[in-house]
């Protein structure tokens, strides 16, 4: 259930701090194609060179990667939008070879691991993204949120997930309803139902007029009222979800 409420680095590329992954913004494909073309052209025509090793007359061929870390990341994002996940993984890893501390490459690998259900890998990558970013880096908001969802989906470290989500809210004012939604799910799992309802209703109040966003929040309210045994509110949310599904 949490997989469509994580941030993706494709969202950050649009120039805002973030947009919700539902699913998803990306670097323009045309731009990505240009990068791919540049990579192929440069690899074939520019980066292949011969080094002669003195009087022995030996020669070796060395290929040099012409792309920088950020270009590998953009190319990885293009592959992700096309569903070519393994190629995306290769590009993110190439970015890390060029820049071992690049937080967005770690974040991209974390998201792919998360979607595959490889939560330990996702947790490690998200933690690396956080460690490699400055404490006041606004991108940390999405790193914190996604790490929170690892803890939610594995039902562990829920208090830590709460702390991370609260830190995300401080870094990203615009994403408030997303983090309120995440908090609502955390409180539901902690059986703090009053706090869960307050957070989810606040998220609903601040949600844009977007059916996907509204559906996610209402699904969480649906689960909350089911656990509470609140039949009236459960029925109300059921009808609302039917309307949103039309």
Name what the model sees in each region.
Residues 77, 111, 149-150, 185, ...:
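Residue-level recognition of tetratricopeptide repeat
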Residues 81, 115-116, 153-154, 189, ...:
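Register position in tetratricopeptide repeats
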Residues 135-198, 205:
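Alpha-helical adaptor scaffolds
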Residues 71, 105, 139, 143, ...:
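TPR alpha-solenoid repeat register
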Residues 66, 100, 134, 138, ...:
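Short coil turns that delineate tetratricopeptide repeat
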